[in-house]
Amino acid sequence: DLFIRGFTEDGEVIGQRTDPEANMWLNPQSWSVISGLANEAQADLALQNVYDKLNTEYGAILMDPPYHAHAFDGALAVIYNAGTKENAGIFSQSQGWIILAEALRGHGDRAFNYFIENAPAAQNNRAEIRRLEPYCYGQFTEGKHSPNFGRSHVHWLTGTASTVMVGCVEGILGMRPDFYGLKIAPS
């Protein structure tokens, strides 16, 4: 029901459910589906856990709970306040991957919901919170653990446009290239 984040050089597991902080990570769940590593039951459970534990009205946060005191050696996320950047912020580029993962599992409505939650044009009614141009993605949006939840930062410094495009075109619209040509399978 949960894919770990990785391992430290000393073999410590990062992102296991018994960790007091950062025990649930977004990217391993998304990529378990995209890579085909997860079987159908594992994929659906991993995606449901993301939706239940990491999703917010602005998109899915990178991990939860944020680091405060317990971080593995070399964890740079701990230098950021809770809810910002790599410390449980909402990284825009990762939204494209969760969109694609949901769509690949046939969850088109949920994939579209993730798209809308983080799409710049859908934020115009919250401009005083977002504080970023309405036509570009920010690198990250402050997550639910931040007092500035919903504020976006670092415009134009992100690969979000391409990952979201892949998530929407190959995922939601279902137009995927394969060895034999173009496969059309909308979610």
Positions of predicted regions on the chain:
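Catalytic cores of carbohydrate-active enzymes
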Residues: 1-77, 116, 120-149
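Well-ordered alpha-helical segments within folded domains of soluble proteins
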Residues: 21-36, 43, 47, 88-103, ...
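Non-catalytic C-terminal accessory modules of carbohydrate-active enzymes
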Residues: 52-57, 68, 79-87, 97-187
